[in-house]
Design a protein with these regions (language model features):
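Metal-dependent nuclease catalytic cores that hydrolyze phosphodiester bonds in DNA/RNA
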Residues: 1-135
Length: 137
């Protein structure tokens, strides 16, 4: 059963993905599938590389934290190591994000600027994506 021919807007995203999962799709977008598999390969390779410790730097994702918290995150005198459980949790999150962006595209939504780097007032960060013209992060 094809997806309903409603205009694709971000507010129909979940409904459209559910429809795709329930009814399937006759032909998959092969370019989208190749991109998804490429992202999966990169994530597995990054996950299984030797862990070099966290890089301490100011990122856009930290906006909103107190100055004191930011100072301690960057200047913490106690060395912290990511546990295997925490690394697994981040890996799972990366895989889930890639899967959902893949499904959004297969459901007919326009997905752009995946993991695009942005710089605001000299601070670097990445956006997850823009779906149907709406920043999704």
């Amino acid at each position: 059963m094809p997806l309903p021919s409603k205009p694709k807007k971000v507010h129909t995203l979940i409904e459209d993905i559910h429809h795709l999962l329930q009814h399937g799709k006759e032909e998959l977008d092969q370019d989208n599938l190749k991109e998804f598999l490429s992202v999966m390969k990169e994530e597995v390779e990054r996950f299984l590389q030797p862990y070099e410790g966290e890089r301490k730097r100011l990122r856009l994702s930290a906006v909103g934290r107190t100055d004191r918290k930011l100072w301690y995150e960057i200047n913490d005198p106690i060395p912290r190591k990511e546990t295997p459980q925490l690394r697994m949790r981040f890996f799972y999150g990366h895989i889930l994000e890639a899967l959902l962006l893949y499904l959004a595209t297969e459901a007919g939504h326009k997905v752009e600027h995946k993991q695009a780097e942005v710089v605001i007032e000299g601070i670097k960060g990445h956006i997850d994506a823009v779906i149907d013209g709406v920043l999704v992060d």
